[in-house]
Each structure stands twice: as structure tokens, then as C-alpha cells.
């Protein structure tokens, strides 16, 4: 039995020797295989960074060049568009100048119909008889407004230029059964009133007229002369 165990050990030794086990363990110690050199070393990272910096700089320059080209094209297109618009607008400018001249001439003609009273201008219609509403429209067509009389001096000045007649002015009370007299120009109560005493308060649609240096009211659909003021504001 001792001899058979010895033969078994010798056989194992021969197999280990044939497999190169002695080469793997020099001086009786095992060693690991040498590691491979890594591809992404610090130097390689630096090279890649320089590459990307260069690439980004080139792309940035390329982008800036594209933007400059686009700006030049846009500027050129705008100049061309402006030139075309100037050409196309010339006839319109001529028409507008002509129209403005006509308006100015028309306004001058209309202003000749107004007379100066104090610091303001009024048109005293002495021939045409209209309802209060028609008189309002007529004054607007003259680029004026039914008169808002500001004080007694102005009232006396207007009536001094007018024959003894009744003249609509811009004061009315169109609400039945109550309400107050207002100016259509301001939407408020009038600046100045000088009422005639003992007036009929039962009249509907009461509109104000001046007569004999006093103010009275009548139904708005009655026909009377009227006074326009040149200014269209209060």
C-alpha cells in the first residue's frame, strides 16, 4: 500500500510539471498578469480637450459669419423695401397734401361765416329756421357746435349782432318729468344761464333759446334761428 501511494504522488507531480506549473510560480510565489495600458490617459484627455476647444472655436466663428451674412442681407432687404415704399407712397402723399389743402380752404371758407364776439367766434344764423336737432347738425357740419354762452357779456355781444329773434343754443332737457338742463358739448350743467321768469314747465323735450337778453325753453321740434360757436370743445 505504501508503494502504491508513492506511485500516485509521482504521477500527480509529473502532470503538474507538464502543465507548466513551475513557470507560474517562480521562487515558489504566484503572480497576477500585468494589466493592459488604459486608452484614456491624462495626456489623451488633454488632446481631446484641445480638439474640442478648437472645434468649438471654429463652429463659433462659422456661426458668427452666418449671423453677419444674415444681418447684411436683412439690412439690404430693408433698404430695398424702404425704397419701394417711398416710390409707392409718393402718389398717396400728393393726394393727402391736396386733400389737406382742400380741407384748409374749406375751413377758411366756413370760418368766414363766424363773427368775433369777445375772444370767441360765433355764427348767428339769421335766415334759416330749424328744429333744435337740425340746428345741432348744421353747426357740426360747419365744424362748429351749438353755442355755449359763458357769461352775460358774451350773451349781450351775440344779441347785439342779431336781429330781434329767437335763437337755439346748446342747452336742453330731453328727459320728461324731471331731469336737469345740460350742455351736449360738456355733458354737464351750463356755464351760464339767465332764465326768463314765469315759463311753462309742462313742455316736453325742453330746449333752450335766447331772446331779448334772456333764456327761455320751448319744445325742441319748434323751428327757430340758432347760434353756432366755432370751437368744438368746452
Curated annotation (Swiss-Prot):
Stated consequence of mutating residue 27 to S: In strain: SFS 1.2
Domain C-type lectin: 137-234
PROSITE patterns attached to this UniProt entry: C_TYPE_LECTIN_2
Gene3D superfamilies: Mannose-Binding Protein A, subunit A (3.10.100.10)
One GO term of the biological process aspect: sperm storage
Disulfide cross-links: 139-228, 207-220
Signal peptide range: 1-21
UniProt keyword Disulfide bond, yes or no: yes
Function, as annotated: Responsible for physiological and behavioral changes in mated female flies.
Protein's name according to its UniProt entry: Accessory gland protein Acp29AB
Organism: Drosophila melanogaster
Taxonomic lineage of the native organism: Eukaryota, Metazoa, Ecdysozoa, Arthropoda, Hexapoda
Gene assigned in the entry: Acp29AB
Amino acid at each position: 500500500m505504501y508503494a502504491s501511494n508513492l506511485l500516485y504522488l509521482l504521477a500527480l507531480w509529473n502532470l503538474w510539471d507538464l502543465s507548466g506549473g513551475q513557470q507560474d510560480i517562480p521562487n515558489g510565489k504566484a503572480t497576477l498578469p500585468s494589466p493592459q495600458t488604459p486608452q484614456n490617459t491624462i495626456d489623451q484627455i488633454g488632446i481631446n480637450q484641445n480638439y474640442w476647444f478648437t472645434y468649438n472655436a471654429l463652429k463659433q466663428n462659422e456661426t458668427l459669419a452666418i449671423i453677419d451674412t444674415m444681418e447684411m442681407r436683412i439690412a439690404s432687404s430693408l433698404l430695398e423695401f424702404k425704397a419701394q415704399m417711398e416710390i409707392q407712397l409718393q402718389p398717396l402723399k400728393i393726394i393727402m397734401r391736396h386733400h389737406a389743402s382742400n380741407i384748409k380752404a374749406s375751413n377758411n371758407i366756413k370760418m368766414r361765416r363766424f363773427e368775433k364776439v369777445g375772444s370767441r367766434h360765433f355764427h348767428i344764423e339769421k335766415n334759416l329756421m330749424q328744429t333744435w336737432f337740425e340746428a345741432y347738425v348744421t353747426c357740426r357740419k360747419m365744424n362748429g357746435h351749438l353755442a355755449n354762452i359763458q357769461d352775460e357779456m358774451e350773451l349781450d355781444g351775440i344779441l347785439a349782432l342779431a336781429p330781434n329773434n329767437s335763437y337755439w343754443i346748446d342747452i336742453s332737457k330731453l328727459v320728461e318729468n324731471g331731469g336737469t338742463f345740460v350742455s351736449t358739448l360738456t355733458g354737464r350743467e351750463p356755464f351760464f344761464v339767465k332764465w326768463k321768469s314765469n315759463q311753462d314747465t309742462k313742455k316736453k323735450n325742453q330746449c333752450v333759446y335766447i331772446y331779448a337778453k334772456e333764456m327761455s325753453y320751448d319744445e325742441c321740434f319748434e323751428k327757430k334761428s340758432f347760434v353756432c360757436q366755432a370751437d368744438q370743445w368746452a
